[in-house]
């Protein structure tokens, strides 16, 4: 985050932030926010492929031509016009960097995502910076570029948590909207219940957070909610 902020300040860089959760700390630095549905990263990569790749081979051109962009946009809640705007914002930039977070490694469609990103790296002028070393190796060594169709988006309804490692606390940080849906208040002790796990946390309402995705703070040595970092959960108040 600090490197991004520094680049924006020093070079007047245009910063386009793509994520299901808006980051209040970055709000004053980004040029454009593309907020998409949880789980739709494969579709987002396809939209990037369509917008940013140049001089592809015929097979990839056909793949792009056959993409149902309207459907992908609708399912991911990220409009084609947002990617057109992102491309327009990039045209006059001398250096263009696409930063790939470590959320993707445990995505159930990671293999096709890796192929999409490998092609974007090969056929666009985007410089890929991949924060996870394992994912970076997968993308850099990907030899099979036979793309699969974009899978229908799995529905993530109700209350969701996004796991973030934080060495200083282990709260459940929620928006007022999330608190209203879950029927909880600030400082309530709650159980967070997923398909396979049940953990206890203290609710902290953050007025700068919006939407129905809560931030689940987790200590680095805490072995909880592994896999894809977003989980569909139920929230249950701890009875005193």
Spans of model-derived segments:
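Alpha-helix N-cap/loop-to-helix initiation residues
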Residues: 41, 105-106
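Glycine-rich phosphate/diphosphate-binding loops that line cofactor/substrate pockets in enzymes
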Residues: 82-97
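Conserved active-site and cofactor/substrate-binding residues in soluble primary-metabolism enzymes
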Residues: 39, 43, 81, 111-115
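Conserved acidic residues
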Residues: 31, 96, 171
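Extended, domain-scale alpha-helical bundle/helix-rich regions
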Residues: 101-102
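Short secondary-structure junctions and interdomain/linker hinges
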Residues: 55-56, 93, 97, 127
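A cross-kingdom feature strongest in bacterial/archaeal respiratory oxidoreductases
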Residues: 1-28, 106-240
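Glycine-rich, acidic loop regions that bind phosphate or pyrophosphate groups
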Residues: 1-78
